[in-house]
Design a protein with these regions (language model features):
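Alpha/beta catalytic cores of group-transfer enzymes, especially the acyltransferase/condensing modules
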Residues: 2-6
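Long, positively charged amphipathic alpha-helical accessory segments at protein N-termini or as interdomain linkers
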Residues: 10-138
């Protein structure tokens, strides 16, 4: 499962993360994955791939998945990539708390993502927030 914006989850535990850094028209992509052992994370449950697959088998799987998604991103409407992300994300309606970079905390229900990847958060009173940066708690 994917947790916005960049966490990779396995059975509700953080397995890894995806980082993107843009410079001009180029983007560097980094993947961090707990292959052999789950680290101790304060306030967060972590997972590793060791019980799911052999660590040496992971690189070809990652390379193939990344190549497919990169092709989708380059050759199609960005909304198709957003839809592909949603099929692997926490379900619409999941209760979330977002801690923004401005030390603001907002809570509501996951309402999808925008075409540019921003999080849609529906507050309890019905208003919709579009979140472009922050840390999400499930």
């Amino acid at each position: 499962m994917l947790k916005w914006p960049n966490d990779v989850m396995l059975l509700g535990r953080k397995l890894g993360g995806i980082l993107l850094e843009r410079s001009g028209d180029r983007v560097a992509v980094g993947f961090g994955v707990n292959l052999a052992k789950a680290p101790e994370l304060q306030g967060r449950a972590a997972a590793s791939l060791s019980g799911v697959m052999a660590p040496q088998a992971f690189a070809p799987v990652l390379a193939g998945s990344f190549a497919r998604l990169l092709t989708l991103w380059r050759e199609s409407d960005p909304l198709l990539l957003a839809q592909a992300w949603l099929t692997r994300a926490h379900p619409i309606g999941t209760r979330l708390t977002v801690h923004s970079s401005a030390d603001e905390t907002i809570s509501g229900r996951f309402d999808g993502i925008e075409g540019d990847g921003a999080l849609r958060l529906r507050r309890d009173e019905g208003s919709l927030d579009i979140v472009r940066a922050g840390d999400v708690e499930l």
